[in-house]
Amino acid sequence: MFARKVYMHLKPNSVPEFTQRLEKDVLPLLRKQKGFQDEITFVGQGGTEAFAISLWDKAENAETYNRGTYPEVAKILATVVEGTPQVETYDVANSTFHKIAAAATA
């Protein structure tokens, strides 16, 4: 399993609109992507920082999303996000929610 972490700096007082755009616009796009597993989004208590972690079956499908659909997602969120979101990628080592165990390495 593979993860994308996207860090965003939110515009002031934009959390309600950010949440609405995620639910109505972004999540439906994600659900259509091959290999998409789950999305978890966190908003800081001050309401100016957020990050989202999307889980994918494999890196190739996450990369296809990154090249194809992600620019559209960034455009959807541009009204509530300041600057350019920072994207990092990871291999998932463990998840109790998804019952994943990392493969043993020699």
Model-predicted regions and their roles:
Residues 1-51, 55-71, 78-106:
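Short S/T/G/P-rich N-terminal loop/turn motif that feeds into the first structured element of a domain
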